[in-house]
A protein has these predicted regions:
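Alpha/beta hydrolase fold serine-hydrolase catalytic domain that processes acyl esters and thioesters
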Residues: 1-88, 107-175
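Gly/Ala-rich beta-loop-alpha elbow adjacent to hydrolase catalytic centers
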Residues: 90-95, 99
Length: 175
């Protein structure tokens, strides 16, 4: 399968299964919900930036390690407290930071990061994280060298920062 006339480089990123498609469906529902979250069985999906308040938090809190003070963190933590069955987290953009912070804040829950897309982390070297994914030209996650980078031929920054393109290729053969 080709995407924008290029064969994507998708080594070891969960293709060949419906992993990314399930995450897309959950994140779509989180973005559509009032509280920016959606639960499916034991997985909490958390929407990323979607309004001016989130943009404010992106600029004034995330770069300074103050994710716990972000509005999205408070929303997700409330849902987490009300749902003790949640064991896995999926996030996109802002909510990647929120997911990671929730995991750290609740060690007793043994929360697992199922997937994070377009994470705004700064990691210039070191080990790749199994469940962090980014597109090659994503401007938000360009300093996250700890994620698995996929080249889908997306050059538009808005498209490259999305999470839904992974699901289009969920049954592609790895190269």
């Amino acid at each position: 399968m080709k995407y924008n006339n290029k064969i994507p480089l998708v080594k070891n990123v969960g293709f060949g299964t419906n992993f990314h498609y399930q995450n897309k469906l959950g994140l779509d529902k989180a973005y559509a919900s009032d509280n920016a979250t959606y639960i499916d069985n034991d997985t909490l999906y958390i929407a990323g930036t979607r309004n001016m308040r989130d943009i404010f938090d992106d600029i004034t809190k995330l770069p300074f390690g103050l994710t716990k003070h972000a509005d999205r963190y408070r929303q997700a933590e409330q849902v987490l407290k009300e749902n003790p069955n949640v064991k896995k987290l999926v996030g996109h953009s802002l909510s990647s930071s929120v997911s990671d912070e929730l995991r750290k804040a609740h060690p007793d829950r043994n929360l697992e990061i199922k997937a994070m897309y377009g994470s705004p982390f700064v990691q210039l070297s070191g080990q790749k994280h199994e469940n962090r994914f980014r597109h090659k030209f994503d401007p938000i996650s360009f300093l996250d060298r700890g994620s698995k980078t996929v080249d889908l031929g997306l050059v538009s920054p808005l498209e490259a920062h999305g999470y839904d393109q992974y699901s289009l290729l969920f049954n592609i053969e790895e190269t």
